[in-house]
Amino acid sequence: YEIYQCDWSSDVCSSDLILYFMQGGLSLPDEAYYRDDQYQPIRTALIEHISKMAQIAGLEISGTSVLELETKIAGFHFDQVKDRDAMLTYNKLSRAEFEALCGGFDISTYITASQVDPKFFNEVIVREPQFFEGLGTLFSNFDLSAWKNWALWHLLSGAAGYLTEDLVNQNFAFYGTTLSGTPKIRERWKRAISLVEGSIGEEVGKEYVKRHFPPTSKAQVQQLVSNLIAAYRQSINELTWMSPDTKTKALTKLSKFTPKIGYPDKWRDYSKLQLTETDLMANIKAIAKFSRDYELNKLAGPVDRDEWHMTPQTVNAYYNPGLNEIVFPAAILQAPFFDPDADDASNYGGIGAVIGHENGHGFDDQDRKSTRLNSSHTD
């Protein structure tokens, strides 16, 4: 559980690895659930859900207190519109500026406890400054019992999916059915696969690629991507409404697109992850520690341009503005999107649309503002 989120990634305006601080601390999807009248039934259901979970676990947790505190926290959140604004959420601050912003929240103690070299806090990106300013006011008027109650709830809620059947089912009744409208929980084996996917996804990916994505398919898709980038280049050149200066910038950015096809060139090493067949929670803790150590190790060097943020067996694709890359996992490079034996028209109409969509993200209302023109060949 996190009152706020902290992660490191490439700075969209430079090649540096930098810490990002983001809002958090809520049990419901976003701040609107705490203020809009239409969500009053959801808020009531949350209180009831917390009470039931606490009863099953044999704990004393006040759902009303959790909701009251989270309503205050939500009041400092950016709404969804602000939170996707690339300019509003790019706030680079020095450590002194960040400490001043947080006020009553002692960020120095956090830095010490994080076990991260303090030099990485010399400059950070704060996505939602008003949240951290508000958090400082909450900590200036600290209600210990309310925060202990909140922390106990989030500890239970975060682990609920791995505990007893009653807790698993009650957790799903609220988050799966009440919030999401899903009537029935997935079979246990499917949930187990999801856990494995989220924990050692690239290890599974190796086997998936071996079975379903031969080198010949990768070569075909690489040619498709190259052709579609060429078509995009031609389209930009032929635009009559775009100024010459803007065209030059757009073409420069397009020329530095880095396509990633199918699977990573360098697989993640899981050899230090020790798991057991008899203790699920011990495995969850081991996975959490392994993941944290993996993230901390990133700070020892430059941005890892070989890293993927989806596994090969994921049916999806993405554009990464920080590295100006378009990424297509092997699982989306299957029928009906792509078939190595199909004619070109079929593949351009299928995976071609996906490739064009991801290309377009580099020039959409937010990612066009990413001025860093990264590629795997230049810096």
Regions found by a protein language model. Give the residues of each.
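Single conserved hydrophobic/aromatic residue that forms the stacking wall/gate
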Residues: 1-8, 12, 369, 373-379
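Compositionally biased, intrinsically disordered low-complexity regions enriched in proline and serine
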Residues: 2-6, 34-35, 111, 176, ...
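Noncatalytic, helix-rich "gating/capping" subdomain that lines the substrate-entry/channel surface
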Residues: 9-223, 227
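Pocket-edge structural micro-motifs
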Residues: 21-23, 330, 375
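A signal for specific C-terminal beta-sheet/loop modules enriched in small/flexible residues
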Residues: 33-45, 340-351, 378
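Short amphipathic alpha-helical segments with coiled-coil-like heptad repeat character
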Residues: 51-59, 256-258, 336, 378-379
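Intrinsically disordered, low-complexity linker/terminal regions across diverse proteins
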Residues: 66, 72, 101-104, 118, ...
